[in-house]
Amino acid sequence: MMTGTTLILEPVMDSKDELVKQHAKVAEDAVAGWEKAENEVVELKQKLEDAADKNIVLEDRVSHLDGALKECVRQLRQFRDEQEKNIQAAVTESTKELHSANTGLEKRVLELQKEAEAAKSENMMLRREFLTQREDLEIVMIERDLSTQAAETASKQHLDIIKKLAKLEAECRKLRILAKTSSSLSSNQSVDSHSDGGRERVEGSCSDSWASSAFISELDQIKNEKGGNRSLQGTTSSTEIDLMDDFLEMERLVALPTETQAKNSKDGYELSLMEKLEKIQAEKDDLEREVKCCREAEKRLSLEIEAVVGDKMELEDMLKRVEAEKAELKTSFDVLKDKYQESRVCFQEVDTKLEKLQAEKDELDSEVICCKEAEKRFSLELEAVVGDKIEMEDELEKMEAEKAELKISFDVIKDQYQESRVCFQEVEMKLEAMKRELKLANESKTQAESRVTRMEAEVRKERIVSDGLKEKCETFEEELRREIEEKTMIKREKVEPKIKQEDIATAAGKFADCQKTIASLGKQLQSLATLEEFLIDTASIPGSARSVHNKEALLGKDPHECIKTINGRSLEFLAIQNSNNKTSPPCSSSSDSTTVSLIMSSNRGSSEKNRNGFATVFTRSRNSVNLGI
């Protein structure tokens, strides 16, 4: 009987648990949605409050800005008037100063231009003079070079002539010696007279030659000096040609053999020799005159060179002075140019200052315009903010109305959804429970009957044990009374304190143990009473495991009440037995104690533990009966 009812009720309990879980989930979802809606409403209220605060702040700000804008406009007008006055005063003063400075600078520029033109013309004149003097100096230098070249050539020719004269004198001596050997005594006398005269001439010529050689040495010393004459070239060249002809003729005569000389007449020969000597003497005189002329020309050229050098030095000094004046004029011109540029820069600075003042004036005008535009913009923004505030209030009212409507519709939908879900789940659970019960009914029928009989026998044993426990409890109570009386007597007699304290402690411990045993016995008695009631109730239920029709009839009744009563009694029974096991007195033996525990699995609906979700197991030990569902 009991097993049948448990098999019937367990799927119902499982289905109800699942329904409870689903309802709990739905309720949690509904609560979460409701909380979410409330949070949204709170957020909207907060936004509305923020918007109202912002509106108030904006109104205060607009009023403050309006006052500040008026003050700014007033200060701006005052500042603009003062600025215009200052600008006009500064412009008039600067124009006056600029006009005076401009006139002074123009005068100074004109003076400087005149001075520059005069310096330029003077510089041109000095440059022309310098060029002419430079050309004259170049001409003088060319003439000096030519004169030096002519003097050098003349000195060379003079040296050649002196050498030729020495050679001629030596030839003459040879001829004289030959003439002396070949001539007669008479002729020797005449020739000696002539030769003495010739010797005198030759000695004079030798003295002249020595003088000419000294003159040549002097010419060599002053070779590097400046001077010369162009007219000497033709004369020296002609004399040189004549001397060369005479020299060649004398060599020819010397080269003639002595036989031809003997054949010629001695007188003619001597006469020819005398003529040649006279010619040579004449040429020598001419050469001496030419040498004198060359010396005079050289002296004249040296004087001219000295004069030219002095003129050159004067011209160089003049050129230096002119260059110094030119540099001074250039520096003065540069200074004037710098002053002109400085004045020009001053003009530009004044122009820039005027432009800056004009720009500042324009900026102030633009700022005034901007302030006016800002005032207009602020007024428009204020109007827009007021309009936004009104719109937000309207939207808030609409949102509150929509919120109320949504709340109502949400409640209706929630109720409908819960009802439909409950109905659907009940139908599914009934179908599943019926299927599981059909499978488990035949299997657990015999086991339930045998276990019920065993439980009845054990309940009888428990009743006997409970009677014994009652008797023990009564005996314990009597002992406690006696101990209390003894303690009171001990207090009256005032025994030693140590014995007194030990007796009190032992008596208190025994008293506590007795109280515990009394409480445990009372709980065991209550559990036995509940177990008897449970067995009576199960025995009164008809055997529904034999037919499906009876099971359906049982399910058609209110199964919730059955589950509640069974669960309540079983749980009370479990609590009593657990407390009895915990508070069992130490004086009672373990063989006399009995425990009945009911263990229910927490994961009843899990598929991992059992496919059907139920497992009914009855185990019986030596001293206890365990019921596991």
Curated annotation (Swiss-Prot):
Keywords: Coiled coil. Residues 186-205 are annotated as: Disordered. It holds the Pfam family FPP. The keyword Coiled coil applies. It is found in: Vesicle. PANTHER family: FILAMENT-LIKE PLANT PROTEIN 1-RELATED, FILAMENT-LIKE PLANT PROTEIN 4. Belongs to the FPP family. Ensures, when in complex with FPP3/VETH1 and COG2, the correct secondary cell wall (SCW) deposition pattern by recruiting exocyst components to cortical microtubules in xylem cells during secondary cell wall deposition by recruiting EXO70A1. Interacts with WPP/MAF proteins. Binds to COG2; this interaction promotes the association between cortical microtubules and EXO70A1. This is Filament-like plant protein 2. It comes from Arabidopsis thaliana (Mouse-ear cress). The lineage of its organism: Eukaryota, Viridiplantae, Streptophyta, Embryophyta, Tracheophyta. The gene is FPP2.
